[in-house]
């Protein structure tokens, strides 16, 4: 049996020039955010407590708790809203197609019976309010001419709805049934976010014109604005009220977050605190989302980093939560410290995770796309979609300065002889391999066939190269760093995708694009375990347990399968739906724990119980 131990989640999806709208539930102290086709439910009391909902067919844009916390409404780029339970396996209550295009925001009414959604209507309705159980429309929302970026339900009687969008307008509706009441054009650029105060007396809008406007919650009349003296110098993307309705938190493209004191009558808002951040100096420091929930002030940067401040002590350094935004392509576990996991994503981000803790630190490689990662205790090697192989030293505080070498070809696979004195690296390309000592090219060898995968033995004395034709070519590595072919093995019916040696070097395993894996005896060159055909699609990754007894495979069919070498393949252990969109990498942490990563940009740890 495979049991999920931990999830190291991705961070919210972000888009430059647009804000994101995160939300939460004050009773359970959990937050909701979206990435890809998944909604992530994350506890602020226990940060390792993460749940994932992945039933949308398209990228999810927004998710909100119902007032009683029992239901969640989430929406996607197709205009679909799904209402599902927070308990008992996320049971689906209803699904409605509410807009013709992307939903940018949605809100529940305070009684939990109605939902309003806004976004891109593609020439049709831009805002719609409907009953949560039947989907019946509750009114007409005229007045907007372009995409409606945000909407808000008044949290007290009488019912009111306020909206804002790309036409620079703030519109106000009363009902139900809802009908147009008034419109305001105080803003001179996109109005990015609109939020009612918890007591319902006011609502506030923030805009790319660097301004915030305050309106009466019942009549919709403008009553004040945020003072500009100490205000933001860039577009304001999001705003969130304090639980007592006296203060607001705003975030901006100027890389700052500010806390404002709002007068009781709403006539003015004044900055009382500008929150401090550690900046990397790049555009990823721009702040695009925020949430004030209980004692937590949460900000989200363009790079996805979530900073958690305490409302009681805003001078206290924030707790940082980070991770990947894009799909995780490769994993490595540091040998002597098997609680440390390294992961990389194709957008150039390398993240260090600690088992039982989660996020530790990260390194953003500028202008580099990463496809493969291999590691020793002292350094990591990465390769991407150009001709470069990078070496990055590992330090106590994170990472050292990166260096690279141009091998003249796009790398396909990379492996390191971790037990050899020189820590030789083998890098394969489309027609051959390169042997590296650090960043020194020892030899470049054209093998005369189409290469698909490769590996070098931990002692550096042997290499195996797999071809597009499914053949395994075994080479001895000579003292002059040349390769001598010793054998050719034929069993696979598809191009090789991955080859790995067992830790004790008595076996090796291979996987192919035709969903088959094979375990081989290294000495006899005979098949030791076959019929490993239980994936339904291409195998992307393969790993051995430290005790040499198990092999794990990951596939684009979303499953991780673990085979026991001394048992028939039919007695496999399967983690189904391990990663939405497919599994890209697997690695053993210890004899009974497997790490996996995939298209959902997350890393998961699984406890494996042998049959």
From Swiss-Prot:
Keywords: Actin-binding, Repeat, WD repeat. WD repeats lie at residues 3-43, 55-94, 98-142, 143-183, 186-225, 231-270, 282-319, 323-363, 446-485, 491-530, 534-573, 578-611. It comes from the Eukaryota. Expressed in flower buds and flowers. GO terms for molecular function: actin filament binding. One of its GO terms (biological process) is actin filament depolymerization. GO terms for cellular component: Cul4-RING E3 ubiquitin ligase complex; cytoplasm; pollen tube. Binds actin. Enhances the F-actin depolymerization activity of actin-depolymerizing factor (ADF) proteins. Interacts with ADF2. This is Actin-interacting protein 1-1.
